[in-house]
Amino acid sequence: MAEQGGLPPFLLGAIRFTVAGLILMGWCVFKKEKIFIKKDIISAAVTGVLLLFIANGIVIWSEQTLPSAMVAILVSSAPIWFVLLDKPNWPVNLKNRATIFGLIIGFAGVLLLFSEQIGGLFAASGGPSKLPWMLLLILGTISWSAGSLYSKHNPSSVSASVSTAWQMIAAGVIYIPVSILRGELNHLNISSVHTGSWMALLYLILFGSIAAFSAYVWLLQVRPATQVSTYAYVNPVIAVILGVVFAGESISFWQLTGLFTILGSVLLINLAKYRKEQRLALVNS
C-alpha cells in the first residue's frame, strides 16, 4: 500500500507510464510520424513489458521489503548481465579485457560506495528471510538487460520516440490490473494525496520517463550495449552527489573512493570502445 499521503506504487506506475506514453505519442502524431506499424508495436510492447513492467515493477515491489542500499547494489549488476546475455557480441565483449575489467571494477566501486552499510544489511533486514526478494530483484535486473538487448537486436522502422511511447503505454496498461488486484484503489483517497506526491509524479512523467527513458532507448539504438549499461554504475554516484549538494549529507572516505572507482571503470569501458572506433576510422580512411 502507499505511504500516508502518497500514491500506491503500482497505481503510480500505471499513471506515470500511461500518461508519459500518451504525451510522447501525441508529440509524434503532431510531427506526423508513422506510429501504427504492427511489427514495431509488438516489438516495443515486448520491450516495454520487460523493462518497465517486469524489471521496474520488481524494483518497486522489492523496495517495500529490502533496504535501499541492497536494492542499489543488486540493480548495479545490470552491466554484467548485459555482457552475459548479449550472445551475438560474445566474441567482441568477452575478448575485450578493458570492457571486462571495467565492468568488474565498476561493480567493486558500487560495493565500496555502500561499504559502510553492507555490514549491517543482513542483520537489519532479517538475513536469509530476504533471500527470495534478493533473487527476485536479480531476476528483475536480468529482465531489464534482456529487454534492452531485445530492443537493440530488433531494430524498429519507426523513430526512437514512437518506440518509446509504445513501450511506456504497454507497460502502463499492464500496471492497471495489477494495481486493481492488489486492492490499491480500495484504499485510495485522492484528497489525502499530498501536493508533493503529485509533484513527484509530474517529475517522473516529464523527466524520468519522457526525457530520461527516451534518451536511454535512443542510446541503445546508436551506441554499444555495454556502454549504455554503465548507467547502472553512474546512478548511485549521482544519488550520493545529490544527497551531498541538496540534502546536506556528508560523504565518507570509502564513498569518495567508490565514486572515483566507478567513474574510472566507466572511463575504461568507454575508452576501449573509443579507441576501437578510432582504429576502424583510420582503416577505412
Residue ranges and their predicted role:
Residues L24, F82-L84, P88-W90, L121-L185, ...:
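Transmembrane alpha-helical segments that form core, pore/gating elements
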Residues M1, V19-K38, F107-G127, A170-G196, ...:
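Membrane-interface helix-cap regions at the ends of transmembrane helices
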Residues M25-V75, L111-L112, I205-R223:
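Specific transmembrane alpha-helical segments of multi-pass solute transporters/efflux pumps
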Residues A2, L12, R16, S62, ...:
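Hydrophobic/aromatic residues within transmembrane alpha-helices
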Residues F10-G13, F17, G196-M199, Y233-S285:
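C-terminal-most transmembrane helix of multi-pass membrane proteins
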Residues A14-I15, L52, N56, V71-S77, ...:
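Helix-helix packing/entry segments at the starts of transmembrane helices
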Residues L24, A45, S77, K95-Q117, ...:
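Hydrophobic transmembrane alpha-helices of multi-pass small-molecule transport proteins
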Residues G5-F10, A14, F36-I42, I100, ...:
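Juxtamembrane helix-entry segments on the extracytoplasmic side of multipass membrane proteins
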